[in-house]
């Protein structure tokens, strides 16, 4: 560890990239505490003190914004609009042939898809900012009767929408700059920072409300979950590939053997985001349709509140688990293209020895991916995502469970990816030094 740090210090270029990354992350965190224009900050503090901002609508989004959502700051939307836009653009490759064509055009096509993602991020940010401003106008955003805006005029609402949308675009710009000029994937690092920022407050809340015994249990569960996630994320199925010998001029090429590494969790955390987004819709309906004057809500609102108002009901848990499994299978099926992989192998004289009994190469690849995804990957994601929900029901902690499976899954994945990129850059500079 100390040797690695010493090598980084002796590499000025890499050190500048790390300093640039940490600087933008620090600015991002400071922006989480800057109130948006037109927001009545004392009213926000009173509503937060009342403790009504709990539940599925808040916990997941607030986790990705590093607490900025409940502060109604300029970065309240966080990185979620960009994540949603990226997922939508990726899924549109299956529906729109033009998007698939752009994806295959490599650098030029990727630049066009990135531009589409930015436009969609702007549209989603405007939509979410308008929703937040409407809820803040009545106080329903934080579950209290106090309006969170200085006044309910259209101008004030418009200023809040502009401030929140601009904040989202600034966060997107931070992420792109980190990816281009810093270390690691910028968007992933911002998510990592937002999740990590909520850990101290979450753990402190567990100690205050549940005691040190429950705190020790939570830490133990978090450590075991982290070890399990590292093991699964680094696991892979290696499909052997053999290349036949070919005669090109006077040279004989090929004849080598390699493998296709297939990760156990190919979908990463995207199915969890899908499932959480779907199950946040009932919470949004509850917030919009719950009377603020204390009168009884409609029967269907009562029914939604009973089953989907929090994450500790068995119906919510079962539906959440099934959605994750379904989305995992769906996402892997549209992102992993066995036909394309098979064509690329045939173009260079490659084949899979084990595919002969199972038929064509693409059918064998589809068979292997289906087994890995459904038997291991989907169940693994479902179990990991269920950890905080089970904790809500068993130990009675709040919705802001600090060491939930989703948060640890994201942090471990981003951490491993960043460490690998730093190591790769260090090795690259080491070999460049030898060549000189």
UniProtKB/Swiss-Prot annotation:
Membrane topology type: Multi-pass membrane protein
Q: Where in the cell is it found?
A: Cell membrane
Q: Which GO terms describe its biological process?
A: intracellular protein transmembrane transport; protein targeting; protein transport by the Sec complex
- Taxonomically, which superkingdom? Bacteria
The regions listed as transmembrane in this protein's record are: 18-38, 69-89, 116-138, 154-174, 187-207, 214-234, 266-286, 314-334, 375-395, 396-416
Assigned GO CC terms: plasma membrane
InterPro entries found in the cross-reference section: SecY, SecY/SEC61-alpha, SecY_CS, SecY_dom_sf
State the UniProt keywords alphabetically.
Answer: Cell membrane, Membrane, Protein transport, Translocation, Transmembrane, Transmembrane helix, Transport
Q: Is Transmembrane tagged as a keyword? A: yes
Does this entry carry the keyword Transit peptide? no
Leader sequence segment: none
Q: What does this protein do?
A: The central subunit of the protein translocation channel SecYEG. Consists of two halves formed by TMs 1-5 and 6-10. These two domains form a lateral gate at the front which open onto the bilayer between TMs 2 and 7, and are clamped together by SecE at the back. The channel is closed by both a pore ring composed of hydrophobic SecY resides and a short helix (helix 2A) on the extracellular side of the membrane which forms a plug. The plug probably moves laterally to allow the channel to open. The ring and the pore may move independently.
Oligomer status and interactors:
Component of the Sec protein translocase complex. Heterotrimer consisting of SecY, SecE and SecG subunits. The heterotrimers can form oligomers, although 1 heterotrimer is thought to be able to translocate proteins. Interacts with the ribosome. Interacts with SecDF, and other proteins may be involved. Interacts with SecA.
Write out the similarity annotation.
Answer: Belongs to the SecY/SEC61-alpha family.
| NCBIfam families according to UniProt | 3a0501s007
State the protein's name. Answer: Protein translocase subunit SecY
